[in-house]
């Protein structure tokens, strides 16, 4: 069994049981955003966390061990995404990426926003013209160093 197969089993079981990521996260004791990323194979769980996830998704000990292995993060295909929702993020970075870069550099200097020392919050924002998706990303600024 591979990590991808474990991820596929998690997703299939989630659908079959009608589970919500927020409910799973509450049982694990972490945010819904981080827990979802972990269950989709992008983060590493502790033994205790893997045990909780394993119980929820009826994973064997061998399958739970895959959840504790450091994954190849960002392992989506390198081609332009075809899923409409993921494509919109690709499009967002294509359109606003240079703006993000300019404004971050203007505010902080030459460096990057960490995706390691990072947190994200996704919420529904009621709006008269139709509900909106509100995503807040917070990453530590890491300046480039001279040497």
UniProtKB/Swiss-Prot annotation:
Domain of life: Bacteria
Active site, renumbered: 88, 91, 114
Keyword Lipid biosynthesis recorded: no
Entry keyword set: Lyase
Reaction(s) catalysed (UniProt annotation): cyanate + hydrogencarbonate + 3 H(+) = NH4(+) + 2 CO2
Class of the enzyme per the UniProt entry, highest EC level: lyase
Gene Ontology terms: biological process: cyanate metabolic process
Membrane-crossing segments per the record: none
Enzyme Commission number, as recorded: 4.2.1.104
Gene3D superfamilies xref list: Cyanate lyase, C-terminal domain (3.30.1160.10), lambda repressor-like DNA-binding domains (1.10.260.40)
Claim: Lyase is one of the keywords in the record: yes
GO MF assignments: cyanate hydratase activity; DNA binding
Family statement drawn from the similarity comment of this UniProt entry: Belongs to the cyanase family.
Function noted in UniProt: Catalyzes the reaction of cyanate with bicarbonate to produce ammonia and carbon dioxide.
Name this protein carries in UniProt: Cyanate hydratase
Species name: Methylibium petroleiphilum (strain ATCC BAA-1232 / LMG 22953 / PM1)
Gene name per UniProt: cynS
